[in-house]
């Protein structure tokens, strides 16, 4: 089963609105409100499909007009704030000294207002960072991805700091590289030798048991040379 989602929203806080299309939970394109053009998540999508950014901008303008009308005729009771769930993980298997990307996945929050900061050893990082637009999640909530290009090191630790109206305080989600444990060459040799000895012992025991079984068999036809 495949699912496509078309998200349009307008709100009184930044970002003031968004128009985005996704397929099977992956963004296809969104409309940049400042540049007034469609931004394709992958360049290949732009060669396969045609989208008029003006249509998305018109939809956002209509949503803003409807929002103002709703505010004027409502009792001004805001929807409850839903705090986000946050996890941090690397894009690729971690190898110390090899370039990688950290992913901060922020999910199931409302409204779509976030402040996200990457920290390395407790200090803000601004280089090598990128992010998606707000994506659709379950029950009219939102999700978002923030990325950090980095080189894993045993000396560095990272945090994804998320601020949201549903949180009493900024939420820090920690990540640090776990250096793989490598056995010394001598230890590997000993383990290999022990494995060989155990294997040979198993073969010897098997031969002895088979020989005893054949000798104790009452059927003379079973007594054949090995």
UniProtKB/Swiss-Prot annotation:
One of its GO terms (cellular component) is MHC class II protein complex. Keywords: Adaptive immunity, Disulfide bond, Glycoprotein, Immunity, Membrane, MHC II, Transmembrane, Transmembrane helix. Residues 211-226 are cytoplasmic. SMART domains: IGc1, MHC_II_alpha. It is found in: Membrane. It is a single-pass type I membrane protein. CDD domains: IgC1_MHC_II_alpha (cd05767). It comes from the Eukaryota. Disulfide bonds join 104-160. PANTHER family: HLA CLASS II HISTOCOMPATIBILITY ANTIGEN, DP ALPHA 1 CHAIN, MHC CLASS II-RELATED. Belongs to the MHC class II family. This is RLA class II histocompatibility antigen, DP alpha-1 chain. It comes from Oryctolagus cuniculus (Rabbit).
């Amino acid at each position: 089963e495949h699912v496509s989602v078309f998200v349009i929203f307008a709100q009184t806080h930044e970002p003031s609105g968004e128009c985005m299309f996704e397929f099977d939970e992956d963004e296809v394109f969104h409309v940049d409100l400042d540049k007034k053009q469609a931004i394709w998540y992958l360049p290949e999508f732009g060669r396969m499909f045609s989208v008029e950014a003006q249509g998305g901008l018109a939809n956002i303008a209509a949503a803003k007009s409807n929002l103002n009308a709703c505010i004027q005729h409502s009792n001004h009771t805001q929807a409850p704030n839903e705090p986000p769930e946050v996890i941090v993980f690397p894009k690729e298997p971690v190898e110390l000294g090899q370039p990688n990307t950290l992913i901060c996945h922020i999910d199931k929050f409302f409204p779509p207002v976030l402040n996200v900061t990457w920290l390395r050893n407790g200090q803000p990082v601004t280089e090598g960072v990128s992010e998606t637009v707000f994506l659709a999640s379950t029950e009219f909530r939102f999700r978002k991805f923030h990325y950090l290009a980095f080189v894993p090191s045993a000396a560095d630790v990272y945090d994804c700091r998320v601020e949201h109206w549903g949180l009493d305080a900024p939420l820090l989600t920690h990540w640090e590289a776990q250096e793989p444990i490598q056995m010394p060459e001598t230890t590997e040799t000993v383990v290999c030798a022990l494995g060989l000895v155990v294997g040979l012992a198993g073969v010897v025991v098997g031969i002895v048991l088979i020989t005893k079984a054949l000798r104790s068999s009452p059927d003379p036809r079973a007594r054949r040379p090995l």
